UniProtKB/Swiss-Prot annotation:
Enzyme class, broadest EC rank: transferase
One GO-annotated biological process of the protein: regulation of DNA-templated transcription
GO molecular function: uracil phosphoribosyltransferase activity
Motif (PRPP-binding): 99-111
Keyword Transcription: yes
Keywords: Glycosyltransferase, Transcription, Transcription regulation, Transferase
Name the UniProt record assigns to this protein: Bifunctional protein PyrR
Species the sequence originates in: Chloroflexus aggregans (strain MD-66 / DSM 9485)
Gene (name only): pyrR
NCBIfam families, per the entry: PRK05205.1-1, PRK05205.1-3, PRK05205.1-4, PRK05205.1-5
Function: Regulates the transcription of the pyrimidine nucleotide (pyr) operon in response to exogenous pyrimidines. Also displays a weak uracil phosphoribosyltransferase activity which is not physiologically significant.
Ranges annotated as spanning the membrane: none
Amino acid sequence: MSNEKQILSADEIRRALVRIAHEIDERNGGLQHVVLVGIRSRGVPLAERIAAAIADFEGTRVPVGQLDITLYRDDLKLRGPAARVYKTDVPTDITGKTVVLVDDVLFTGRTVRAALDAIADLGRPARIQLAVLIDRGHRELPIRADYVGKNVPTSLSERVKVRLRETDGVDEVVILRGTNND
């Protein structure tokens, strides 16, 4: 695996998520109207971890949901006719709330655009914010994250891979060189 380079360790991921949790609290003047919504698949455990960090320092549990954007993607035809659709589960009404979308990597912005469309079908939030663990640049759409764990400039031939304990058995972020197939 010589084409892999670790850019975040487990402890660095933990610290980034705790910092993001504090920033969400500070920017919103409290958490009473905040809902975290993880974009499937790795955004969901990240949203859960941010909620756990908030519970640790605020003593309150922020609602956490999960959002499947499969049917909202503009590249659905490229992924083939058998695209698997997962459950969207947002445990509270989002109308009038601050929804913080959570994802692992911000790249072109197309995933976030699809998530915005999906959220619009669920209600009318007062505002929507975006939290990402990694922002790697190369935007194709005018989208910017409100909360970023780490900015990682990359080339288009590189791929950022987030591995999480919940899905991969280990916490780390690596860059794979010369293997971008997104």
